[in-house]
Amino acid sequence: MALPATDRSPRGRILVADDEPHIRRILVTLLEAASFQVDSVADGPAALELLEGQDAYDLVLLDIMMPGATGLEVLDRLRELDHRQSVPVVILTAKGQDADRDEAFNLGADDFVTKPFSPKKLLARIDEILERD
């Protein structure tokens, strides 16, 4: 179930998809404090539902290991959608193996961040990605 953000933000709109409630809370709090509008979901199918809908996102943060569909499956589907092909995607995961990283980039990820992560560094990476797009 998506937790909708309450207001529009000039910094952009981000979708957070992670099955761990405490990680979602940390990310939502961090991003809202940085003036982003944030929606969050706990599984792959919910992420796909929002991404396939009419709402536009400026960036998507995806965990790899989620129920229903992995973050990599969501990324693969996202890149097939005509109206969402260019949405930047950051994979945020505890799976830091080279094979996972390679697969994510081969599917079109813009960045790959391993958990645990530095909130300051994550925000800097998000800003960098949004500035280049």
Question: Residue ranges of each PLM-predicted region?
Answer:
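The feature encodes the CheY-like receiver
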Residues: 24, 66-68, 85, 97, ...
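Hydrophobic/aromatic residues positioned on beta-strands within the core alpha/beta folds
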Residues: 90-92
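Charged docking surfaces used in two-component/phosphorelay signaling
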Residues: 25-33
